[in-house]
Design a protein with these regions (language model features):
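Short beta-strand-to-loop capping motifs
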Residues: 6-8, 65-71, 110-116, 173-177
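Ordered, soluble secondary-structure elements with a strong preference for glycine-centered loop motifs
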Residues: 14-18, 70, 74, 120, ...
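Short, charge-patterned binding micro-sites
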Residues: 36-66, 97-99
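Ordered, amphipathic secondary-structure segments that act as subunit-interaction surfaces
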Residues: 60-111
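Short amphipathic alpha-helices in soluble, non-transmembrane regions
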Residues: 74-84, 120-132, 187-188
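Core RNA-modification/binding signature centered on pseudouridine synthases
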Residues: 131-219
Length: 219
């Protein structure tokens, strides 16, 4: 299995996961790169993204899996970048070795923005919130009859750094990636719930790295 490491930025942040898959399938065709297809009466290009990115997030560490058939891997980035839309950039193509189950953590940078500047005491309030022994929030769940389930966020947060930067507060978060994973939007929701005086006007999300259990880059 081969992997494409790519970035997603600017207007490409708003491409949904399904549309992103279709975009890559079309771009392989335009680039003249043959990849493995599914078998059957309606074969289609086999591509997958192990950790789909939420709409509106930027990322410098996305990974797409495929099987390149007859193109040297070192040629793939240049040819794909000529075919992909603006905001999506393939950095490299390589032979995947690590199984997806070893993708353990995700590093996010969440920027909390305030139109009138960060409120006094917001940084310490948020730091205190993320230092609690327990932080329970409701999240959507298809399995629950009510459509929601309570989850304690603290066991899913491996590391959290809070830093005020002029009119913003930056959260450097390392969160569980899967089984279960934690969406950083839940942390922003927790700030709005438990620290309303520190609630941002809006938040900007960036995925910076995908990591293994030892906090090393997963590839």
């Amino acid at each position: 299995m081969h992997r494409l490491a790519f970035t997603k930025a600017d207007t490409a942040k708003f491409i949904s996961h399904l549309d992103l898959m279709r975009t890559f399938q079309r771009s392989f065709l335009r680039a003249g790169i043959h990849i493995k297809h599914t078998e059957g009466f309606n074969p289609h290009a086999f591509v997958s993204i192990p950790l789909p990115l939420s709409v509106g997030y930027s990322s410098s560490c996305e990974v797409l899996e495929c099987q390149v058939l007859d193109t040297p891997l070192e040629e793939v980035p240049q040819r794909m970048n000529a075919a992909l839309p603006a905001g999506i950039t393939v950095q490299r193509c390589y032979e995947g070795v690590r199984p997806v189950k070893e993708l353990y953590y995700v590093n996010y940078i969440v920027t909390l923005e305030y139109e009138a500047g960060a409120p006094f005491g917001a940084e310490s309030a948020i730091r205190g919130l993320l230092s609690r022994d327990s932080l329970v929030m409701e999240k959507k769940s298809k399995k629950a009859k009510s459509g929601k389930v309570e989850v304690d966020l603290i066991p899913l947060i491996a590391k959290a750094t809070v830093e005020e930067r002029r009119d913003t507060i930056a959260l450097d978060l390392i969160l569980k990636a899967q089984n279960p994973g934690l969406n950083p939007e839940l942390i922003v929701s927790a700030i709005r719930t438990y620290c309303p005086d520190a609630a941002p006007d809006y938040a900007v999300f960036h995925r910076r790295a995908v990591l293994d259990e030892r906090f090393q880059n997963w590839e």
